[in-house]
Amino acid sequence: MSLKLEVKTEIKLDYQGFQNQINEFHKRINDKNSPDINFLGWNNFPEVAINPQEIARMRKIVENLHQNSINVLVVIGIGGSYLGAKAALDFILGLGPFENKPEVIFLGNSLSSTDLYQKIEYLKTKNFAINVISKSGSTIEPAITFQILYQFLIDQIGEKLAKTRTFVTTSIKSGELLEIAKSNELEIFEVIESIGGRFSVLSSVGFFPLLFAKINVDEIIQGAIEAHKKYSTSSISQNLAYKYALFRFLMYKNFNYKTEILISYEPFLIYFNEWWKQLFGESEGKNLKGLFPASAIFTTDLHSLGQFIQDGSKNFFQTIIYIKKPKFDLGIKKLVQFNSKINKLSGKTVSEINFQAFLATTLAHSSYGNNPNLVLEIADSSPKTFGHLVMFFEKACAMSAYLLGVNPFDQPGVESYKNELAKNLGWDR
């Protein structure tokens, strides 16, 4: 998979002055004696992240579910426990709607009673299974949802059958969810201790939902392996992941930009953008430091945010993901019933016009709007490309956080709201 990176800005950037720092942090990411080795399982790929025996077990389970007409999987999880899988499904399949295909529904990522109620109403007519994902089981959103949905499944089909349709992805060492799974004799998949949630899509956390949806997980793994090798050098000129990390750092530190907007030209990248926001937001946003990760989908958001991006305050830069080959395309035919200027576009395809919009917008924002633009061009939206892009961003994120002087692998600020909520509820986490 080819990934191209192009910077469009008048700002002069000196990358080579940082090579020694990059070398130091590269060693920290890759050295087996790194002080952060207990958080680097995602980078020990595929040896630590991939469990072939567990994937084989998942395949058999999925095959059995499909043979028994279980056509809906409800994934219960929040943050990294669902964003990666949702991003992958949309990236690879598109947004549909789909007929006669396995469906994956995501719950437990909010405390909305309305959303939960409406999805349960939908499930009343479906044959469904549950995959609850939580390292410990003490996160309130998925914990509540699992309790409600598991009871609903028992009411629908009985406890004995419900146990055969409920799958738990959690730590195999300890935790409340592990104890629940064991005491109820539920199937368990492993959350690897050395892989944090936001880095976990290329592991069992992401693979079971993807296998259920008949995604080619082997191709995802192959794409990630290729990216892992490609971005294994410390050379800034040869490692685009590190070059992207350094570009972000320079925008923040040397030129005082506070926000990075990740822009895509395909609606099916909405949740990829959300995954990226968690990856960088939780990894960098600490010690009063870090770029605020925002996102937009063009051309849709050009009709809401376009004015601000062009003429508003200049505290942001843009990173653009552009997919060279669309999944599908449509030609525009002349319609004699319409006496319209749009008829002049007949003979073109929708993707050709989208590409011209990308070129025009990038020029307008970078040249006339004075917004630095970094373009990441990818070949397609295949499973292999997804695996490659995830590994690219994960490596870039670790380097970017180290350059910033923060720990990429903790998220102490998230605990603050959790602890206060537990106090309000009188709940012992």
UniProtKB/Swiss-Prot annotation:
Catalytic activity: alpha-D-glucose 6-phosphate = beta-D-fructose 6-phosphate
Molecular function in Gene Ontology: carbohydrate derivative binding; glucose-6-phosphate isomerase activity; monosaccharide binding
Keyword annotations from UniProtKB, A to Z: Cytoplasm, Gluconeogenesis, Glycolysis, Isomerase
The keyword Lipid metabolism appears for this protein: no
Record: active site: 282 (proton donor), 303, 418
Matches recorded under PROSITE patterns: P_GLUCOSE_ISOMERASE_1, P_GLUCOSE_ISOMERASE_2, P_GLUCOSE_ISOMERASE_3
InterPro entries: G6P_Isomerase, Phosphoglucose_isomerase_CS, SIS_dom_sf, SIS_PGI_1, SIS_PGI_2
Biological or metabolic pathway of the protein: Carbohydrate biosynthesis; gluconeogenesis; Carbohydrate degradation; glycolysis; D-glyceraldehyde 3-phosphate and glycerone phosphate from D-glucose: step 2/4
Family statement drawn from the similarity comment of this UniProt entry: Belongs to the GPI family.
Job description of the protein: Catalyzes the reversible isomerization of glucose-6-phosphate to fructose-6-phosphate.
Protein name, UniProt field: Glucose-6-phosphate isomerase
Organism field: Mesomycoplasma hyopneumoniae (strain 7448) (Mycoplasma hyopneumoniae)
Upper taxonomic lineage: Bacteria, Bacillati, Mycoplasmatota, Mycoplasmoidales, Metamycoplasmataceae
